[in-house]
Amino acid sequence: MKVLTARQQQVYDLIRDHIAHSGMPPTRAEIAQQLGFRSPNAAEEHLKALARKGVIEIVSGASRGIRLLMEEETGIPLVGRVAAGEPLLAQEHIECRYQVDPAMFKPSADFLLRVSGMSMKNIGIMDGDLLAVHKTEDVRNGQIVVARIDDEVTVKRLKKQGNTVHLLAENEEFAPIVVDLRQQSFSIEGLAVGVIRNSDWS
């Protein structure tokens, strides 16, 4: 690991402390504001320098996509967009980690998934929520699952009958997704075990 300049150390310490206190990395704007930079672009340049020195990793496409590499990572990983054919928990899909005790969920949460859309709103799962997921393939009919259909990931209520799977929305405006197991690729990524709703985290 290369030696950090005093300014780079300030940025690194700010990121580490922000994660410790709020459970998530700061945005570029927050770094700029707290350290007196003229703009978020100045913060971005310092982040790039830290990334070149191997102490952080920048996750593209995420405003809080900063991962510390100097210390052992803790907390629950937030999974971002998943590329077709790749594992859900592949390192490159993890936007950041939230300092939440996995054991607060039963069974314990292995990862968080950002909810997109309102198909499950009738049971309180809203667009932008962070869905806590226990990674397992052992699920039963009627449970809320994270499923992958032909490389598309979705959150729905499971109903399996023979070679047919019905993935049911909890919103009357959304039709069920019907999967023919003889013709389509289908897998269970996990069981929904809770929801985190915080406008600051979305």
From Swiss-Prot:
The active site is at S119 (for autocatalytic cleavage activity), K156 (for autocatalytic cleavage activity). The keyword Hydrolase applies. Pfam families: LexA_DNA_bind, Peptidase_S24. The keyword Nuclease does not apply. Disulfide bonds: none annotated. It catalyses: Hydrolysis of Ala-|-Gly bond in repressor LexA. The record marks A84, G85 as: Cleavage. It comes from the Bacteria. InterPro entries: LexA, LexA-like, LexA/Signal_pep-like_sf, LexA_DNA-bd_dom, LexA_repressor, Peptidase_S24_LexA, Peptidase_S24_S26A/B/C, WH-like_DNA-bd_sf. It is an enzyme of class 3 (hydrolase). Residues 28-48 bind DNA. Keywords: Autocatalytic cleavage, DNA damage, DNA repair, DNA replication, DNA-binding, Hydrolase, Repressor, SOS response, Transcription, Transcription regulation. GO terms for biological process: DNA repair; DNA replication; negative regulation of DNA-templated transcription; proteolysis; SOS response. One of its GO terms (molecular function) is DNA binding. Its EC number is 3.4.21.88. Belongs to the peptidase S24 family. Homodimer. HAMAP family: LexA. Represses a number of genes involved in the response to DNA damage (SOS response), including recA and lexA. In the presence of single-stranded DNA, RecA interacts with LexA causing an autocatalytic cleavage which disrupts the DNA-binding part of LexA, leading to derepression of the SOS regulon and eventually DNA repair. This is LexA repressor. The lineage of its organism: Bacteria, Pseudomonadati, Pseudomonadota, Gammaproteobacteria, Enterobacterales.
